[in-house]
From Swiss-Prot:
Protein disulfide isomerase. Promotes the localization of acetylcholine receptors (AChRs) to the plasma membrane. It comes from Bos taurus. Glycans are attached at N205. This is Protein disulfide isomerase CRELD1. Disulfide bonds join C46-C49, C155-C169, C163-C181, C183-C192, C278-C281, C309-C321, C314-C330, C332-C343. It is a multi-pass membrane protein. GO terms for cellular component: membrane. Keywords: Calcium, Disulfide bond, EGF-like domain, Glycoprotein, Isomerase, Membrane, Redox-active center, Repeat, Signal, Transmembrane, Transmembrane helix. FU repeats lie at residues 208-255, 268-315. Residues 1-29 form the signal peptide.
Length: 420
């Protein structure tokens, strides 16, 4: 393969890179993508560049391992010295840098391939860290560790120890982000250098801070014990350095509905529904009612269900009363069913006969078929010379002939033939 010429950074390439990468002096242009039904967050270009460099370095290790591994050491050293910085090796590495489905990696590689070639053939010795040279210095997609934003400003707490080591600096290592510290649980402040709400300083020196949890209801404290509270969380009151639960149900802080009652809980309260028997209540059950609901009556200290069925409340004939909780309903007595608003006798249907669902005409046809079979049997016996059966046969034929010649027979036969 003929060696590729190192052409440097062509102006056309710079314009292409500016669309994706944002060189100094050029405007960062974000290519808009039509909104999709499920939003997809693309990785920051710095992360794509870091992934490309990591894959490139793995490719360097793979190509050395696959091509050399035992045999004549002198021969390998000679060949390795020629292969190590060759274009052949570079092509082998670049072919495996991006996975087939990683579109961002392929796009970045296409736009920066000449830069990678320039580093490979000319810059390796003076800039051995490809990530620093390509992603930070050349493409300006990334920032050094502990810095963020277009100008690579130090994160709160300093670049050496961003966020004091107790949080994450948003955008750290990239040309984006706000630099805001997202502190770990228990830590707070601009650079996570203070203990957060509900925590106290268990240990502190020039470079080290340990924040431990206060006793449960304490918002601020001087130590872990119950008596170390300096400020209480909502729902608690400070009393002699201890946080005591406030009974909101005994104050105007509780706000429950007319048909609810208040139950105090630690640091708060709950509103629960009154019993069905109550119109307003002071607690759970029918014995804590302020007033009884319709359908209930005061019996001693409780609101109990009124049995309306003790009086004649169902005037309908064949009706009977059924008491329900707080009310009643009228139902039909046994052996009756409701039909059009009244209770009627529930007639038990008789057992259906074998021919009960057949029409009259269908029965007539069935009769004709039956008599036809009888006549055939008689004809068979008459053919044997039996005079008695011969006489019966002649009479049956005469009777059937008269029927079939009748008007009714014509109508039945016509309906049977036509399927009516």
């Amino acid at each position: 393969m003929a060696p590729r010429s190192s052409r440097g950074i062509a102006p056309a390439m710079l314009c292409g890179l500016s669309l994706f990468l944002g060189f100094p002096g050029l405007v960062w242009v974000q290519i808009s993508v039509p909104p999709q039904s499920s939003p997809h967050t693309e990785p920051h270009p710095c992360h794509t560049c870091r992934g490309l460099v990591d894959s490139f370095n793995k490719g360097l290790e793979r190509t050395i391992r696959d091509n050399f591994g035992g045999g004549n050491t002198a021969w390998e050293e000679e060949k390795l010295s020629k292969y190590k910085d060759s274009e052949t090796r570079l092509v082998e590495v670049l072919e495996g840098v991006c996975s087939k489905s990683d579109f961002e990696c392929h796009r970045l590689l296409e736009l920066s391939e000449e830069l990678v070639e320039s580093w490979w053939f000319h810059k390796q010795q003076e800039a051995p860290d490809l990530f620093q040279w390509l992603c930070s210095d050349s493409l300006k997609l990334c920032c050094p560790s502990g810095t963020f934003g277009p100008s690579c400003l130090p994160c709160p707490g300093g670049a050496e120890r961003p966020c004091g080591g107790y949080g994450h600096c948003e955008g750290e290592g990239t040309r984006g982000g706000s630099g805001h510290c997202d502190c770990q649980a228990g830590y707070g402040g601009e650079a996570c250098g203070q203990c957060g709400l509900g925590y106290f300083e268990a240990e502190r020196n020039a470079s080290h801070l340990v924040c431990s949890a206060c006793f449960g209801p304490c918002a601020r404290c001087s130590g872990p014990e119950e008596s170390h509270c300096l400020q209480c969380k909502k729902g608690w009151a400070l009393h002699h350095l201890k946080c005591v639960d406030i009974d909101e149900c005994g104050t105007e802080r509780a706000s429950c509905g007319a048909d609810q009652f208040c139950v105090n809980t630690e640091g708060s309260y709950e509103c629960r529904d009154c019993a069905k028997a109550c119109l307003g209540c002071m607690g759970a059950g029918p014995g804590r009612c302020k007033k009884c609901s319709p359908g209930y009556q005061q019996v001693g200290s409780k609101c109990l269900d009124v049995d309306e069925c003790e009086t004649a409340v169902c005037p309908g004939e064949n009706q009977q009363c059924e008491n329900t909780e707080g009310s009643y309903r009228c139902i039909c007595a046994d052996g009756y069913k409701q039909m059009e608003g009244i209770c009627v006798k529930d007639q038990i249907p008789e057992s259906a006969g074998f021919f009960s669902e057949m029409t009259e005409d269908e029965l007539v046809v069935l009769q004709q078929m039956f008599f036809g079979v009888i006549i055939c049997a008689l004809a068979t016996l008459a053919a044997k010379g039996d005079l008695v059966f011969t006489a019966i046969f002649i009479g049956a034929v005469a009777a059937m002939t008269g029927y079939w010649l009748s008007e009714r027979s014509d109508r039945v036969l016509e309906g049977f033939i036509k399927g009516r």
